[in-house]
Amino acid sequence: MTIKANYDSAKQAYEKWGIDVEEALRQLEQVPISIHCWQGDDIEGFEVNKGELSGGIDVTGNYPGKAQTPEELRRDLEKALSLIPGKHRVNLHAIYAETNREAVERDELKPQHFENWVKWAKNLGLGLDFNPTLFSHEKAADGLTLSHPDPDIREFWIRHCIACRRIGEYFGKELGTPCLTNIWIPDGYKDIPSDRLTPRKRLKESLDRIFSEEISEQHNLDSIESKLFGLGSESYVVGSHEFYLAYALTNHKLCLLDTGHFHPTETVSNKISSMLLYTDKLALHVSRPVRWDSDHVVVLDDELREIALEIVRNHALEKVAIGLDFFDASINRVAAWTIGTRNMIKALLYALLLPNGYLKQLQEEGRYTERLALMEEFKTYPFGAIWDSYCEQMGVPVKEAWLYDIKEYEQQVLLKRKASSPIV
């Protein structure tokens, strides 16, 4: 059967449940995924004086073809975007500034250092998101930044975050879509602290300073991201979930939930509905934690589907900013972007193709047998045929055909790049 014939047959199956497949695809097309640039170069960035990767983050593997220049990274992103249906966004860290080989400190970064990124995004019709980089730097060597007891170090990082908000504002003005500028810090202690309050008090004061400059939300949205623990901060993290949730609600900022930043038995999908009751908008970094915050490539597993379902069921496609955050140097990096982003979009499509209203009614009426039965039966409904048709409509490869494009790109481009030292 052809793609169209499969689509028509699948469409009929869904229409029996009152599901408007064409409307579902229209909604899906409007959802941008923020694709993180750092998968392409193992979070190295382009600083003249690069620091070793720190902040409790680790990238393993040494697959050939890592991007080593801004041009290579943008070229790789373009390749991935050509294989992913829809119009999306690219998420940058401050270490991806282009300073023309001049050593520019992070607290001195300006919009001009990201002009090439903006021109590129404008040409492709992309939005840009941003992150200050509070790791891989000598002033973060002891694992403390915005909560540091040394006021000089603290001030340096405050200035860096202020500079990054201005860069985010620049992105938003130039591209006509608000930039999400997200702050994550590695601050914490390896062993049991004797004072949990004072570092958090300093962090609160630092954030107050950073956000004191009024920037229109038409151009820049601020988010803050928590974490349960990291390498070197196993016992205590200053920016805990409770801290940032309270700060975000009190100060009208977005709380960003990273799917790898909680206890392995906690799920972000279970938090979304609670958050939506108290905030107009929230942000996600979708990753795949394997026993810890390992940042594996996103796969179409139960939790990814549940995240998508919570967004769709609660009519929150415009309220939740969906970003990705994973990095794997053991596989083709362009393929990693492609696999992870396509899976995020697949999960959203899956959620859009469920009879969510009827399933809610079953729950309200206490008809739990039917609820479970239908939720399970829909797992084998022909959503793949709808996905294939959507990919064809969007002009991207259907099924695994994209993999042949990746293999060709690897042979013609990636394997011709100079080998780099392994990161293990």
Swiss-Prot record:
The reaction(s) catalysed by this protein are: L-rhamnopyranose = L-rhamnulose
Essential cofactor(s): Mn(2+)
Record's superkingdom?
Answer: Bacteria
> Which Gene3D superfamilies does the entry link to?
Divalent-metal-dependent TIM barrel enzymes
Q: Which UniProt keywords apply?
A: Cytoplasm, Isomerase, Manganese, Metal-binding, Rhamnose metabolism
Q: Which GO terms describe its molecular function?
A: L-rhamnose isomerase activity; manganese ion binding
Tell me which Gene Ontology terms the entry assigns under biological process: L-lyxose metabolic process; rhamnose catabolic process
Example GO CC term: the record gives: cytoplasm
Pathway it belongs to?
A: Carbohydrate degradation; L-rhamnose degradation; glycerone phosphate from L-rhamnose: step 1/3
- Work out whether the entry's keyword set contains Manganese: yes
Q: What is its EC number?
A: 5.3.1.14
Cofactor: binding comment:
Binds 1 Mn(2+) ion per subunit.
- Which residues are Mn(2+)-binding? 261, 293, 295
Q: Name one Pfam family in it.
A: RhaA
NCBIfam families, alphabetized: PRK01076.1 (NF002203), rhaA (TIGR01748)
Role: Catalyzes the interconversion of L-rhamnose and L-rhamnulose.
Per the similarity annotation, which family is this? Belongs to the rhamnose isomerase family.
The protein's name is: L-rhamnose isomerase
The coding gene here is: rhaA
